[in-house]
Amino acid sequence: VDIVVSMVFGPKEIEDVLKGENGMLQTSCKDKVWIDLTTSSPTLMRSLAKEFEDAGGYSIDAPVTGSLDSAIRGDMIMFVGGSEIALEKAREVLDRIGKTRRVGKYGNGYVAKLVNNQLWKIHASAIGEAMVLAKKAGLEPDVWWEVMKGGAADSFVLHHDVPSIFAGHYDPSFRVELALKDLDLIQELVKEHNTRAELTNSAHERFKEAKERYGDEAGEMTVCKLIEEDGNVNLQVDGDWIAPWEVKHPNDK
């Protein structure tokens, strides 16, 4: 195998991929290319990549962002870090996975992914608060959604994830367990670099509450369900809301 692509739950699992009993370091790594798509710790991954490169391999970090429907369509975005030599060796495979966004040296892809998810989780929590406030003040959720789009508060999360609240499934294609794992990694990065992160701390607490109330398998947007229930309102809206897992690949008939 010349190129290995990995995408697992988190730091412990990716460390096992490289250094476990049957890990890559147990075989010849010379001239092999390792592309990792996992959301993980930049510090840990830079250390693991050095071990792989010391064994003769090339490392690329390419954590993905988007959604399940992005993966189905084949247009996921990858935050790609690594040397130019490694990138050229990996380019054909990367181009088949999705779209690349170059972020510099190895490890920067993990940084980009974590701060991307930092904004995403804060925004998801804020959407729940705004929707509940709007509903209690007399503005219906579907009207709120339409007037927010195109304004200063517009975003991918607003367009993509609010329908999962309307539908009442809260998008189980990305579990709250995974969202909380990402927030734990973000908190580690915040502590490592000693930055202020009050909004991140608040979102972290909201997602912890959602996990405790609804369980690991609940959808990521149950953070909004939590705020709904605490506000004693219902944000569901009748409509033909297409779930992310129902999206078709462009070549499917």
How should each PLM-predicted stretch be described?
Residues 3, 9, 13, 33, ...:
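Amphipathic alpha-helical hairpins
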Residues 1-59:
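Rossmann-fold NAD(P) dinucleotide-binding segment
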Residues 108-230:
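Helical "substrate-binding/catalytic lid" subdomain
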Residues 95, 234, 239-253:
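ATP-dependent carboxylate/acyl-activation modules
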Residues 4, 58, 100, 140, ...:
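Residue-level detector of anion-binding/catalytic polar loops
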Residues 39-121:
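Rossmann-fold dinucleotide-binding core
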